[in-house]
Amino acid sequence: MIKVNLDHTNIDINKVVDLNKVKQIHQMIINKTGKGNDYLGWLNWPNDYNKTEYEQMKQVANKLRSEIEVLVVIGIGGSYLGCRAADEMIRGLYHQDKVELIYAGNTMSSTYIYQLVEYLKNKNFGICVISKSGTTTEPGISFRVFEKLLVDKVGLNKAKDLIVAITDKNKGALKQLADKKGYQTFVIPNDIGGRFSVLTPVGIFPLLVSGINTDNIFNGALKAKNELINDDLSNQAYKYAVIRNYLYNQGYKTDALISYELQLQMLTEWWKQLFGESEGKDNKGLLPSSMIFSTDLHSLGQWVQEGPRNVMFETIIKIEKPNYDLNVPIDEDNYDGLNYLTKNSFHQINQTALKGAIQAHSVTGNMPNIVLEFEKMDDEQFGYLVYFFELALTMSAYLLDVNPFNQPGVEVYKYNMFKLLNKPGIK
């Protein structure tokens, strides 16, 4: 369901790949012997997810869905990016479905939080708070705000039915709070890190409340697991990892993920965390960036075309079938001179822009373009691409000889912030 097309890189990957190394790393992955192997639980998750808990989540989600208009998903990083990526990719940006998902706990902006409070005052809403520890600053202080808003609105007894916590099975501040107050809880597995957790209750529960078919998401992930099993470049995930690593070793610094669909913008944000937090260690790693074309062709396109060379390459998501399409209307006066486009649909024009940009950037601009060919934007495709990118990332990180599953660098800013805020115990 995803094909890696390297025709626009001017590279014969079979001549540059160290296939023995790929095979060696493949064995490290499947045998769980590489760095950070305690966090490879996602590898077999499409088979091994807790079916009993999944059915419980469906029941709770259906009840919640019948009572609310809005679900406030409170989390940061991997605790919300995957869910939001799925929601926007599958339902689009202006869907008319019964339950709206909105997001908090991913910022400390007072203006954003205030406006969200005002928006919710006249809405029937529930809360899904997501945190392994329950002590992460952004979701912690946001949950205080929205929990109070909900309790003040409906009372404590009713609020118990409208708040769900996704957290550790046995310990942590959020687990302790939820048990004390009687909130329903579901489990974040110990062997799956946050940025790999979208197919766990972290992403699946709020998506169930939204009405998205999560069975199809699991089907897509399982299909990827069953297809991406080879230890050579017929494995499309490994093919993507190898070409990225080759370009990195040639001196390229940035991999820009390009989408021509606005509803994939949050997918690119999820991808940036997945690759950036996993690879950016020991002074190594490509900088993951993203652009939305054709929008950014009118702002960053000049830099892409004529800026410094051998700094950035592009990974382009090409969608074969849009969720919807429409034609360009005829205008009798034709003042804009665009009637020649009325023979084409918007998707055909968008695809033509994609082809034109690839030619401009890869041929004229001499910038490698990797094309990821997706069939469509639906629930099954989302499950597939999650597994594809997680496997590609793991191979890519091991090719760099870094641990894909830790993130020690993010603790530095937290320490400085806590010290400035006079947090007890911080010197």
Curated annotation (Swiss-Prot):
Pfam families: PGI. Pathway: Carbohydrate biosynthesis; gluconeogenesis; Carbohydrate degradation; glycolysis; D-glyceraldehyde 3-phosphate and glycerone phosphate from D-glucose: step 2/4. One of its GO terms (molecular function) is monosaccharide binding. The active site is at E277, H298, K414. Its EC number is 5.3.1.9. The keyword Transferase does not apply. Its main location: cytoplasm. Coiled coil: none annotated. It catalyses: alpha-D-glucose 6-phosphate = beta-D-fructose 6-phosphate. GO terms for biological process: gluconeogenesis; glucose 6-phosphate metabolic process; glycolytic process. GO terms for cellular component: cytosol. Gene3D superfamilies: Glucose-6-phosphate isomerase like protein, domain 1. InterPro entries: G6P_Isomerase, Phosphoglucose_isomerase_CS, SIS_dom_sf, SIS_PGI_1, SIS_PGI_2. CDD domains: SIS_PGI_1, SIS_PGI_2. It is found in: Cytoplasm. Keywords: Cytoplasm, Gluconeogenesis, Glycolysis, Isomerase. Catalyzes the reversible isomerization of glucose-6-phosphate to fructose-6-phosphate. Belongs to the GPI family. This is Glucose-6-phosphate isomerase. It comes from Mycoplasma mycoides subsp. mycoides SC (strain CCUG 32753 / NCTC 10114 / PG1). The gene is pgi.
